[in-house]
């Protein structure tokens, strides 16, 4: 078990601990539960879906990287597949505050990058900020997405974001978590191809500036992130943050990164290179390359 889980795990009910122990035994537990695992945990612990999600929130919150605020937020995105995806907030010392990943963004990006096709609900331990409410409005689940908070009745995103502005106001038909493939040819080595594949998945209907990042760890593991734009622009999630989020959720640290590649178009309206390189260097990674999509 990764050390970050130990304190929260010890506070769980005994029957839930017994069911979770084999799942968490892997130091690189992927911070997700399959539909089958969720069903087993519900039956073993005698909890319904909502109660189980609340019980697991402290585990998700331990995944936070909050070197600046020291305020851990955890979230669980529940996919329409039945799979559950942990998320937690991330802050990057030496970078800028704009590089921060919110817990809801973390869980949603986690689900999207693992191939989830849509979300039924998001469970979070603190009220979603306006930034996250707007981010969630880009999803193909729209305003019907259920939001679950401790001590409150569940509500839809529509309740939390009245008079919402979103992609439909801009006549955008393809939404975040809809399947997309922009068709860029895979070239280069394995890491380069992973970055291009991530760029092919980009949700960028506003700038038409695809980008993807691939991070290679010292043990050979590769994590990728795809660019996810938002109708309100500022809640957009850069590809590096998606990749760093997956890396951290899987129990790796920034020091484990040995190489990074950004894939983007050289003539795009928006360029990720400077911000990507600056953030990676702040985290100690200097082996950074760029491949141009064509």
Swiss-Prot record:
Species assigned in the record: Salmonella dublin (strain CT_02021853)
Assembly: Homodimer.
Active site: 104
Gene: cdd
Keyword RNA-binding: no
PROSITE patterns xref list: CYT_DCMP_DEAMINASES_1, CYT_DCMP_DEAMINASES_2
Domain CMP/dCMP-type deaminase: from-to ranges: 48-168, 186-294
Alphabetical list of HAMAP family matching this protein: Cyt_deam
GO molecular function: cytidine deaminase activity; identical protein binding; zinc ion binding
Protein name per its UniProtKB record: Cytidine deaminase
Binding site for substrate: 89-91
Residue ranges crossing the lipid bilayer per the database entry: none
CDD domains: cytidine_deaminase
Keyword match Metal-binding: yes
């Amino acid at each position: 078990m990764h050390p970050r889980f130990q304190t929260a795990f010890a506070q769980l009910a005994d029957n839930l601990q017994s069911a979770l122990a084999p799942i968490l035994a892997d130091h690189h537990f992927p911070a997700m539960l399959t539909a089958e695992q969720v069903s087993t945990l519900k039956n073993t612990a005698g909890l319904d879906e909502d109660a189980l999600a609340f019980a697991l929130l402290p585990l998700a919150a331990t995944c936070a990287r909050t070197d600046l605020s020291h305020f851990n937020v955890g979230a669980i995105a529940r996919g329409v597949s039945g799979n559950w995806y942990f998320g937690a907030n991330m802050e990057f010392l030496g970078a800028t505050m704009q590089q921060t990943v919110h817990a809801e963004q973390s869980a949603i990006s986690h689900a999207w990058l693992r191939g989830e096709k849509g979300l039924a609900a998001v469970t979070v331990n603190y009220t979603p900020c306006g930034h996250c409410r707007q981010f969630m409005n880009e999803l193909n689940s729209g305003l019907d997405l259920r939001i679950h908070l401790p001590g409150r009745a569940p509500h839809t995103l529509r309740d939390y974001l009245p008079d919402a502005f979103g992609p439909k106001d801009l006549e955008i038909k393809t939404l975040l978590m809809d399947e997309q493939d922009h068709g860029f040819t895979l070239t280069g080595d394995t890491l380069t191809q992973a970055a291009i594949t991530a760029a092919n998945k980009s949700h960028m209907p506003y700038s038409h500036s695809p980008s993807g990042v691939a991070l290679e760890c010292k043990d050979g593991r590769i994590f990728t992130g795809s660019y996810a734009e938002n109708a309100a622009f500022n809640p957009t999630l850069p590809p590096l943050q998606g990749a760093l989020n997956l890396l951290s959720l899987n129990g790796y640290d920034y020091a484990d990164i040995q190489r990074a590649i950004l894939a983007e178009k050289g003539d795009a309206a928006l360029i990720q290179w400077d911000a990507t390189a600056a953030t990676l260097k702040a985290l100690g990674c200097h082996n950074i390359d760029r491949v141009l999509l064509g």
